[in-house]
UniProtKB/Swiss-Prot annotation:
Matching InterPro entries: Ankyrin_rpt, Ankyrin_rpt-contain_sf, PRANC_domain
KW Repeat (keyword) present: yes
Transmembrane segments: none
Entries under Pfam families matching the protein: Ank, PRANC
Placement of ANK repeats on the sequence: 33-64, 68-102, 106-138, 142-173, 178-211, 251-280, 284-313
Protein name: Ankyrin repeat protein T5
Coiled coil regions, renumbered to chain: none
KW Nucleus (keyword) present: no
PROSITE patterns registered for this protein in UniProt: ANK_REP_REGION
Amino acid sequence: MDLYGYVACALRLRYGVLDAFLNVYNPDELSAMDDTPFSLYLTRYDCTLETLRLFLKRGVDVNGVRGTRTSPLCTVLSNKELGKEAETLAMCLIDAGADVNARGADGRYPLLCLLENDRINTTSFVKYMIDRGTLVCVRGIDGCGPIQTYLRSKNVVLETLHVLVRAGASIHDMDKKYGFNILQCYMISHVRSSDVRILRFLAGQGVNSSQGFNATFMFDMLERKISYGVFNRKVLDFIFTQISVNQQDSLDFTPINYCVIHNDRRTFDYLLEKGANPNVVNFLGNSCLDLAVLNGNKYMTLRLLRKTITPDAYARALKVINYNIYSINSFGMREFVTRHRTMYKALIRSFIKDSDMEIYTYNHIYDFFKEFVDECIRERDAMKADVLDSVSMFDVIFGRVSRIRWKHVRVISKYVRGAYGDKVKKILRSLYTRRFKTNRLVHYITDLCGTSCLWTHLPVEVRYTIVDYLNDGEIHYLFMKLHA
C-alpha cells in the first residue's frame, strides 16, 4: 500500500504510520482521479492540526498542484465533517502561504466555500478572511456572489451580512436561473427560520423586484409557511407590508383559505385579527366556512361564525353537512357525523339566527336535527316578538343595539336554557361585571364627596344613570384615577 492508498482506505490515520509513508512517497503526486494524497487527506473526517503540520513539514504545495480539481483551502473549507476543526486547519494553511483568492479548476473560491459551510461561517472567521485580503466580488460556477451564497446556508447571522456589505459585496445580485433577488433567495432557503431583522435589512438596502412578481412571490412564500405550520408574527407583519391580507393568487385563494385547508390555527387567528375576509370565494366555489366544515375543524368553524357570514357561504357549508348526513350509511360517515355533531348544530343555530332562508330546503339536515331545528326557530321567533321599549330581545341579544342596559336582564334571562343560552349567559356575565364596577364607582364617589357635596343630594338612580353612560374603559380609568 502506498501513501494514496493509506489515506484513502485507513479507518483512522496514525501519526507514526503517516510519517513513515511521507518519508517515502510524494504527497503532491497526481493520481488518475485528478487528486493528490494531500488533497484526499483534506477530505477526511479525522484531519488534525498535527497531521496537517506533518504534511506541511514535508513541503506540500498549499495552493495545490496543477491538474487537481480544487485548491486545498477550498477542500478544507468545504469539509463539513470536520466541524469547527476546519477553521483551525484553514488558518494553518493560510499562515503557511495558501492563497485566499485561489480559484480551483472547478471554479470555486475559498470565500464562497466558507460561506456555504454553516459549521464555520461565523462572523469572526469571515472577518478573518476579509482581513487576509479575500475578494468579495467573486462569483461561483452558479453565478452566485458571496451574499447570495451565504443566505443559502443554514447559519445566517445579521452581523455577518453587515461585514460582507461593508467589505463591498454586492447585495443586488439576481438568481441566474429564476431571476430571484437576494431577499427572495433568503426566504426560499429559510421558509421555517426566517429572521425578520434580516428581511428588514435586505429590504432596507433597496432589494426589490417588479411589484407584480414580488406580490406573487410573497404570496407563494406565505402559502409555504402556512403549509409547514410555521408561525412568526413579526415575519407575517413584514410579508403583509408587501401584500394585502385579502390578496388572491391565480386560483383566487386568499391566505386565510390556505390556513383553513392546512388547519393552521395560529395564522388563521392572526389573519382574522388583521381583517381578512372569510367570505372570499375561490375558483372552486369554496369559502372559508365550507372548507372548515369539510375539514371537520370545529375551532375554525366556531371562530368564523362570530364573523359576518354571507348567505351564500352559509348555503355552501350547509350543503356539505346535508351531503354528509345523506352519506351516513357509507363507510365511516356515521362516526364522522356523530363526532362533529356539536359543530353542525352550532352552524345550524347561527344560520337560523342570521338568514331569512329556510332550513327546510336541506331535507337531510332537517330530518336528522328536527327537534333542534324546531327549537332554534321557535326561540328566534319568540325573541323577535319579545319587545321592550320598542326594542326586540333578538336585537338586544345579538348585538344590534348600541348598549345592553340593566333593565334587559330580567327579560333575556328566560332564554338562558334555550338553544341560544350560551350567548345569553355571556351577555349576563358581562352585565353583572359591569354592574359591579358601576356600583363600586358610585359608592367610591359618594364616600369621596361626603355629605355636603351636590353628588350626594342626587337621587341614587340618577347617580347610577350618570355612571352607566360611561363605557367600561372609562369606568376603570376613573376608578383608578380617584383611587390613586
